[in-house]
């Protein structure tokens, strides 16, 4: 059973910023042909947008595991979970970050949750996961730990 599920969709401003491929491709292809330039611009922009959407990872907590992107952490190895937002989230991503930590960070999602890893054979001390709803993720992780 799924206790929590979130897809880390790109922020709207990212699609606006990606629109800069339109004038860039027009600049390159209009000297060849205006129609070719317009078609290439639209195709490149659409391709970039589809790429952003397809690359959006999923964070999911089930009765069996925590899934963050392509990584999976079995329920038995889920330790304490702590939510951070604002300046605390910035510190967790920067000055407090352990180089051995496993990261699923997205620049357009500020809050993060740190999940301790209890597996003695795993050199990763914790996972740091971007989430738009840190309290719900921490609550789901608490119920997953049992």
Question: What does each model-identified segment do?
Answer:
Residues 1-31:
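N-terminal membrane-targeting/pre-transmembrane regions
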Residues 130-146:
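Cytosol-/stroma-facing membrane-proximal "stalk/adaptor" domains immediately downstream
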Residues 69-128:
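Non-transmembrane, membrane-adjacent beta-strand/coil modules in membrane-associated proteins
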Residues 62, 118, 130-132:
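A structural detector for beta-sheet-dominated domains
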Residues 17-21, 40-47:
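Lipid-exposed faces of alpha-helical membrane segments in multi-pass integral membrane proteins
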Residues 32-41:
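Short, aromatic-rich membrane-interface segments at the entry and exit
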Residues 42-82:
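Conserved beta-hairpin
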Residues 21, 45, 60, 114-118, ...:
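Hydrophobic, well-ordered secondary-structure segments
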């Amino acid at each position: 059973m799924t206790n929590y599920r979130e897809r880390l969709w790109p922020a709207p401003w990212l699609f606006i910023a990606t629109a800069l491929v339109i004038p860039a491709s027009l600049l390159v292809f209009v000297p060849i042909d205006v129609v070719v330039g317009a078609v290439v611009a639209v195709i490149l922009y659409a391709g970039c947008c589809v790429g952003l959407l397809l690359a959006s990872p999923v964070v999911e907590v089930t009765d069996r595991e925590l899934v963050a992107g392509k990584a999976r952490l079995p329920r038995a190895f889920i330790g304490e979970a702590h939510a951070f937002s604002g300046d605390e989230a910035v510190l967790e991503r920067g000055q407090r970050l352990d180089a051995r930590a496993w990261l699923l960070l997205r620049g357009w999602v500020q809050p993060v949750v740190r999940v301790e890893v209890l597996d003695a054979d795993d050199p990763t001390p914790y996972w740091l996961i971007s989430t738009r709803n840190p309290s719900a993720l921490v609550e789901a992780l608490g119920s997953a730990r049992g």
